[in-house]
Amino acid sequence: MVARLAMLACLLLLGVSSARASGPLLVFAAASLRNALDEVVQAYPGERPVVSYAGSSTHARHIEGGAPVGVFIAADRDWMDYLHDRGFLIPGTRHDLLGNRLVLVARPGSELALAIGPGMPLAQALGDGRLALAHPDHVPAGKYARSALERLGVWQQVKQRIASAGNVRAALALVARGEAPLGIVYQTDVNAEPKVRVVGRFDASLHPPIVYPMALVRGAERRADAFAEFLRNERAQRIFENHGFARLH
């Protein structure tokens, strides 16, 4: 029985290795990177990778489950730490790639005005609606938003009125479709969606630094290293900047 289990484990590992070697490079990236990273991939002079976009928590769980990923770009340090602590990253390949800002958004036709500050009447501004957030317990954008609202003393007002989404782009879509009157997303998400407008910007001191770390996943090939290096060069960084991301190096 033990021998059979050992053989099965070997076959599974060989299957993952074969998937890495035979198919295109697979990149897992935070959903908020979609537009910018798609453009970066088009500019890449090598073999173009396949990029999967989702919440960083979802990606981290899939990597933990053995997904044949070469490069992981998260939207916060926590999920990268999670994988590092469990030995899923190649030592020495982790870098902080980009920064971002957190904003409160509404539909363009909305006349709602709300100054972001301690004790702001956020619940009143929502009326009968809900506040769209990426899941505040485990998705980076939602965690940043919860931290900011707690620091402002208004989380208790709205915690039972959250329209929770699996990632920040899904939260953005709730506002764009008019299903939620307000949402908290990244500045770069607004740049990618004409059907929302910024009501206010959260001061960076209200939440942990919004950082997108990048690392190579254990078992990644040399082509993963080449693409990761391209993400940090001038051409790629200029594309990210054009989409509203901040340079960190």
PLM region spans:
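Bacterial N-terminal signal peptides
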Residues: 4-15
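Sec/Tat signal peptide C-region and signal peptidase I cleavage site
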Residues: 17-21
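Exported/periplasmic ABC-transporter solute-binding proteins
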Residues: 22-67, 72-77, 81-249
